[in-house]
Amino acid sequence: LFKKAYEVKAKYVGKKVYYRGLIEISNKCIKNCKYCGIRRDNHKVDRFSMSKSEIMEAVKWIYENNYASIALQSGERQDEEFVSFIEDLIREIKNFSNSKLGITLSLGEQSKETYRRWFEAGAHRYLLRIESTNLDIYNHLHPMDNKHTFEVRKKCLEYLRDIGYQVGTGVMIGLPNQTEEDLVNDILFYKDMNIDMIGMGPYILHKDTPLGQEWKDIVVSEEKRVELGLKMIAITRIFLKDVNIAATTALQGLDPQGREKGLLAGANILMPTATALEHKNKYLLYDNKPGINDS
């Protein structure tokens, strides 16, 4: 399966691996997703927001090391202060790099107007994970309130497409009670939504979360989750042929060779973290995250 996926990758997107420098600019979040380490109600988290100059330091490093693009990721905020901070930041990155650096955003659910402002400032890709297309699983991953609905998440992906972004999404793999049929439906969702890039990886628990507690004894083995993660990359590559697929940090979190195995199974994007060292260990969406001491 992996060999076939690699052949399809070589034919449709080439053997080249594209690097995106990932900067985790803030772990402040208004959401309360039940699996995530930086959820609003986790009071053990040391919250931070990088300043513009700190972020630009990281951008400079990424640019000087010949990365083609950067990705800005943070917890979700929808206030005007945050929205205009990002808008200004995008413009500054564009100016600094003479528009050479591609800009990917992963900043959660926003209004169509906000997405448009960021697009017009110069961002051209957006990653917003659907997490799972099985509604029962989706609703179990999130609090049942009007801030965490599948409909809004899907609508946001449609807004992004309408505005002109390259649209990225992805799912968590190896969740308790998730079937192979669910995962196949996730891949069909990528096709139906005409998704351009995919970032998906094995689920990893975070002990200070509701699901980290609820699932700690029933989660499938790490080996099985890695295997499922790699199979998902391979089948997605064979089925969708020319999409961009990331070999995610979560794969590496469960297997030291996980990202390399991901590339051999059909992935073509790596997203090394360029977050400031002093903040890396605060942006922990799950336990045992790799790379937090890498400089």
Give the positions of each predicted feature:
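Canonical Radical SAM [4Fe-4S] cluster-binding loop centered on the CxxxCxxC motif
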Residues: 7, 13-54
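Core AdoMet radical
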Residues: 40-54, 62-83, 89-90, 94-156, ...
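Conserved strand-turn element in the central/C-terminal portion of the radical SAM core barrel
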Residues: 70, 77-80, 104-106, 110, ...
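Catalytic cores of alpha/beta
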Residues: 111-120, 176-191, 253-264
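Conserved, mostly hydrophobic/aromatic
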Residues: 5, 33, 72, 128, ...
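Auxiliary Fe-S-binding modules of radical SAM enzymes
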Residues: 1, 7, 63, 191-295
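Generic structural signal for well-ordered alpha-helices
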Residues: 21, 56-59, 86-91, 115, ...
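Glycine-rich, proline-tolerant flexible connector loops at the mouths of alpha/beta enzymes
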Residues: 20-23, 43-46, 71-83, 141, ...
